[in-house]
Amino acid sequence: MILLGSTGSIGTNALEVASHFDIPIESLCAGKNITLLNQQIAHYAPKNVCIADKNDAHKLINGNYKLFFGSEGILEMIESSHSHLLLNALVGFAGLKPSFKALQCNKKLALANKESLVNAGWLLQNADITPIDSEHFGLWYLQNNRPITKLYITASGGAFRDYPLDKIALATPQEALKHPNWQMGYKITIDSASMANKLFEILEARWLFDIESIDAFIEPSSSMHALIEFADGSITTHISTPDMKLPIAYALDKDKAAQMPFIQPLDIQSLCLALKNIDTLRYPLWNLKDTLLHTPQKGIVLNASNEIAIEAFLAQKIPFGHISALILAMMEYFDSFKFASLCDLESIQAFDNQVRAVSSQWLERKIKE
């Protein structure tokens, strides 16, 4: 297996599942957590290793592996790897080109990088992709080739689900990172607090299941992951212990996954499930759901401005409320852009750069106010 993003929460879980399935690890890619990467190299003995920064090379342990660097190094490593299975758990726009390279090299793509579909779903719509996400796994698990009327996914509500409404706008990174149910990376935890993550997942579902009728609810326990309303009027739901090992296992080997208990079963009698509407006063980004489903190419604006905002937020340059404010401002600014012109990776990259530049200028003005 080729694993991109091996030191993150998805990556470490994927390695654990791969060990259960006796899947050898041919290639590992990681960012700045060299200490954990060294442990993985020692344990899994990969033939290829890629790190983000060449200056970190001296920190790596010795081994019989070929070393690659940076974004171009990821693409080179994919090309030189013989494994048929690639799991992309990179964070952000950086995961887009590796997804395309994997498919160009006829790899089976297990996709945890949401931004690949958010930024270029129309170019990937007919590709062989297995999503690694509890919500999309739940939808896949339920669909069973029956005619579908509507898809529903659930949200935890993030760190500010029960937070005083008047204090959210000025919240700090420390407060935004207190997720009630999951232990995840910084970016996805903040995306959960702002509801940007659920917008990403709505767009993913749009491309994966080729349907525009999609909605989401808050389900505080994170035990109910997805619901499908079928043409016959019935609704089914996928309920399980919140544990990413289950969707990862099915993405790596669905036949083996169906035979092995990777998660603890829920105590059904103790379940207390409630579906709540997503309040746009608490989550102003949720106002974008319909426009994104209607023009999903606008996901590029959502993603690029969000990444710029989160970088500034984590650096404590802006309060939490500026994340939504920036994204909403950029969606309005680029509303008249000819999104139909985004027909290849080059045009998507150029537009992404443009959105980032305008977003940075907007933030600079805000910071000076």
From Swiss-Prot:
Its EC number is 1.1.1.267. Mn(2+) binds at residues 133, 135, 201. Its cofactor is Mg(2+); Mn(2+). It comes from the Bacteria. It is an enzyme of class 1 (oxidoreductase). 1-deoxy-D-xylulose 5-phosphate binds at residues 114, 134-135, 156, 179, 192, 197-198, 201. Gene3D superfamilies: 1.10.1740.10, NAD(P)-binding Rossmann-like Domain (3.40.50.720). NADPH binds at residues 7-10, 31-33, 113, 115, 185. Keywords: Isoprene biosynthesis, Manganese, Metal-binding, NADP, Oxidoreductase. One of its GO terms (molecular function) is 1-deoxy-D-xylulose-5-phosphate reductoisomerase activity. Pfam families: DXP_redisom_C (PF08436), DXP_reductoisom (PF02670), DXPR_C (PF13288). GO terms for biological process: isopentenyl diphosphate biosynthetic process, methylerythritol 4-phosphate pathway involved in terpenoid biosynthetic process. It catalyses: 2-C-methyl-D-erythritol 4-phosphate + NADP(+) = 1-deoxy-D-xylulose 5-phosphate + NADPH + H(+). InterPro entries: DXP_reductoisomerase (IPR003821), DXP_reductoisomerase_C (IPR013644), DXP_reductoisomerase_N (IPR013512), DXPR_C (IPR026877), DXPR_C_sf (IPR036169), NAD(P)-bd_dom_sf (IPR036291). Pathway: Isoprenoid biosynthesis; isopentenyl diphosphate biosynthesis via DXP pathway; isopentenyl diphosphate from 1-deoxy-D-xylulose 5-phosphate: step 1/6. NCBIfam families: Dxr (TIGR00243). Belongs to the DXR family. PANTHER family: 1-DEOXY-D-XYLULOSE 5-PHOSPHATE REDUCTOISOMERASE (PTHR30525), 1-DEOXY-D-XYLULOSE 5-PHOSPHATE REDUCTOISOMERASE, CHLOROPLASTIC (PTHR30525:SF0). This is 1-deoxy-D-xylulose 5-phosphate reductoisomerase. It comes from Helicobacter hepaticus (strain ATCC 51449 / 3B1). The lineage of its organism: Bacteria, Pseudomonadati, Campylobacterota, Epsilonproteobacteria, Campylobacterales. The gene is dxr.
